[in-house]
Amino acid sequence: MDVHERYRTESHTEATGRFNERFLLSIASCKACVAMDDEFNILPISSHIKSITPVPVKEDSEGLSEAEKDLKDLKEQLIDDFPVGPLIKKCCTLDQGKAVITFLDSILDKTLRSTIALLAARGRGKSAALGLAIAGAIAAGYSNIFVTAPSPENLRTLFDFVCKGFEALDYKEHIDFDVVKSTNIEFKKATVRINIYKQHRQTIQYIQPHEHEKLSQVELLVIDEAAAIPLPVVKSLLGPYLVFLSSTVNGYEGTGRSLSLKLIQQLEQQSQTSAQGVEGALSGRLFKKIELSESIRYASGDPIESWLHGLLCLDATNSVPKLSGLPHPSKCELYYVNRDTLFSFHKESELFLQRMMALYVSSHYKNSPNDLQLMADAPAHHLFVLLGPVDESKNQLPDILCVIQVCLEGQISRASALRSLSTGRQPAGDQIPWKFNEQFQDTVFPTLSGARIVRIATHPSAIKLGYGSQAVELLTRYYEGQFAPISETDSENAVENTPVRVIEAAKQVSLLEENIKPKKGLPHLLVHLRERKPEKLHYIGVSFGLTLELFRFWRKHKFVPFFIGHSPSTVTGEHSCMVLKPLNNDDIEDKGSDEFGFLGPFYQDFRLRFSRLLSQTFRSMEYKLAMSILEPKMKFMEPDSGTSTLDGFVTSIKEVLSPYDLKRLDAYTSNLADYHMIDVNVQFGRTVKHLYQEKLPVSLSAAQASILLCIGLQNQDVSYIEREMGLERQQILSQFIKAMKKFHKYLDRIASKEIESSLPRLSEIAIEPTKVSMEQDLEKAARQAEADMKSDLKGVMDPELLEQYANGGKKSSKSKTDNDSGRKRENAMEMAEERVVSKLIHLKGIIT
């Protein structure tokens, strides 16, 4: 099939036509289907046509059934009523006509305090009835009418019947009203607005479900396919105005089940309490519920409708059985589902398939028949189910607690990765490898093999009981090889991966001789993980719409984000998010020892880029979600005052603040300056970025970190924090100044160390201990003193010195000369003695 081209990837090229096989087998079960060849020969698959019998129809003399006659009478009774009469003529069934009358009664009442819910199966005319009711509201003078649905494509029928209603009311296009088409490529030129000018300026405007803030001036709000919109979003759309909502109770548009059991039940209770005089949020409102049972597309009881619903699993919501019990998650086991057996059209396999699709639809996934074919034929997709303890003594299907659909990705050649980077084009499939390749310009990651969890759906009666977590945990352990296979041969895998040569088999037998029937000898539907050898993977990834609850779920299982889309979805208003979890594998060198494995550097780069985008792209993101994504470290060990700053932290004040910023921060923490001194004049954003990069070891509480994120990274004011966190302004500023004091304490310590390191220091004298004993030291000093004394005495008794005192003149002067020389000798002796004494005193000082 041509559609198989979309299912093929570089590493998975063989698609199997299970969907077509099941389709042909289902035709044989439909008694109203006739299969013929190009020569109009009835094929053996439609042999039941031989026993066809006419079906009796109750008709009156005019050829009308009883229901058609009642509709004709209703139209004749209201022919003169405006605007009801002209609009009723456009109705095809009696149920549809009564629904339009109910809508118009509440419109003409103009009390704007009614909520009307329209529930029906597919093909009953819900959207057409809403379109005719909107045309009646315009005729009644309503000016502001808003319409919402999961997508504008869901409103094609509604807007078509608005225009048909205008034609019935004699409105002319381009004269009395204009139709505006969407310029968004994703909306495929769907109608998004109708401007009416006949009476006065009137507008019918499409809004997206999450844009409830635009409903300030609305008079009538119409919600089509409300079951496909998350319940909290639908509740946010309700208000003090007229509300019409419709829901399909089967099919892919939504469950209808969640809506009818929760929202409609709540609206009925509020209507009853208001009637009893109890005040509430929506007190005083009237609620009505309309159900359409008569089909427009098919006759009553047409087997084609039931056959189509069974083939495409459109009655999936009716296939959700009640659980027989809720076992503990630790006692549950994960099983691999063999798709050959699942789509074999056997009775038990069909029941199991219907139950699996019921979980998909009840989990508010956007479903279509294409998804069913993807499950059946895509070569890279695999299915797992979480089951409770199986009682083999009972011959019945076990309860399905959780379903996981996995798509194998990766194993892309490096040449393809380089080609994608050079051309900017990405082939279909392999979402996570190509997105990783684009974000980090990395050509190694696409060559790794991984698995992307496409869908995970839990039974509606078992939500938030731990079954989804158990399924993810078992799936991770399975791909890490913790479930050792019982045998090395994988017979089940060989059966599924063997392609069926359909064309070759068709040439062996003609159509008139071919007998189509379910296969025999198929493998078991459910295979325990120990009985199947897992594919060798390096990571598991997920792509989902970013919400706080979903992100915390995946983060709890150690998945880390690497991509968040900058533009929110036009349908849900959510940003797309991709997360990864590395698996324990010996093929990859892990340089880090943390939980992120080889993804550590990429995760840190993502956090850095995300913190920069918080002031722009993600400025309005909920602070709790931003905190969960950044996941800052808020508790640090207090370093000792004598130790140096730890590695990885800020070591220079210039990296964070200027000297003047530090002075202003000091003034604020000393209560000498106002809060705006910090908010405006200090480079506060840079400081908070260092905190969230774990470069500032400042311990903060969760409230303080959240306030700093809003002010420093998202550039929000205190009023915004008051609304988001529900705190008083004084409480916010109190927490803020506490955090600033902690910042100031650390930064002031850094500044003090910088100043201390810049001051000149005196050189230190190194004193080494002596290596000789005290006795040896004393003996050495004594010998030195004795030598000094001898040298001093030798200098005194020097002959040359004494020669100057010798006799050499007249005798008359002899006595005088002798006296002078005697005195000089005495003086020399005294000086020598003094020097000896001083040496001894010095020696004594050294010894002591």
What positions do the PLM features span?
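Hydrophobic positions on the alpha1 helix immediately C-terminal to the Walker A/P-loop
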Residues: 129, 133, 471
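Inter-Walker segment of RecA-like/P-loop motor cores
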Residues: 150, 157-215
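Acidic, serine/threonine- and proline-rich low-complexity intrinsically disordered segments
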Residues: 115, 444-450, 454-467, 472-848
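Signature of the SF2 helicase/ATPase Hel1-core->accessory helical subdomain module
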Residues: 227-281
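N-terminal pre-P-loop "Q-motif" helix
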Residues: 66-75, 84-114, 129, 701-703
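Conserved coupling/interface region of RecA-like P-loop/ASCE motor cores
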Residues: 4-66, 83-87, 91, 264-322
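A conserved beta-strand-loop-helix scaffold within acyl/acetyltransferase catalytic domains
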Residues: 343-461, 478-530, 546-548, 565-568
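Conserved RecA-like ASCE P-loop NTPase motor core of nucleic-acid helicases/translocases
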Residues: 117-119, 141-155
